[in-house]
Amino acid sequence: MAVKKKRGETKEMEAEKILVVDDNKEIVYSISELLKYEGYETLKAYDGMEALDIMERENVDLILLDVMMPRLNGLSALMKLREKSRIPVIILSAKTEESDKVSGLTLGADDYIEKPYNPAELIARVKAHLRRYRVWSNMEAEKKKDPDQIVNGGL
């Protein structure tokens, strides 16, 4: 399937899917639009519970996660997510204390970006984490192959 990319380009593959989680609808909208412009598909959630529900139904390639949200905050959602998944999670938060960053990274976040964020930096980090996740996913798939298939190249 051809996916429309920025500036009219097409790419013969499925767009990578990013879940944007923040209780501020304007932030979710602006990040989603930025990601769509870069060729990504986006899903939106407005708290941690909604994010976990989406994760049960959808195959997501990366999560952008706020910390301070109602119902289930970002750190609690991250802990529950890490019980089941290694999908890259980038915390995007107004909490800027070093202890906040250390907590997020210790609980399993792959990166921590402070708000207000720089759009170019956000996109660069998203691309870097997606690259690493693709490499990791490919390695995991290779591990699951029959050893004879790996050694003999499927012959």
Residues covered by each model-derived region:
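Short, Lys/Arg-enriched segments at the junction into DNA-binding effector domains
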Residues: E16-K17, A128-L155
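Active-site residues of response regulator receiver
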Residues: D22, D66, S93
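Two-component/phosphorelay signaling modules centered on CheY-like receiver
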Residues: K25-L43, R57
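Acidic, metal-coordinating helix/loop segments flanking the phosphotransfer/catalytic sites
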Residues: K44-L62
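Acidic catalytic/metal-coordinating carboxylates
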Residues: Y46-E50, N73-S76, D100
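Conserved phosphotransfer cores of two-component systems
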Residues: E56-E58, K80-I87, L107
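Receiver (REC) domain active-site loop signature in two-component systems and cognate sites
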Residues: M69
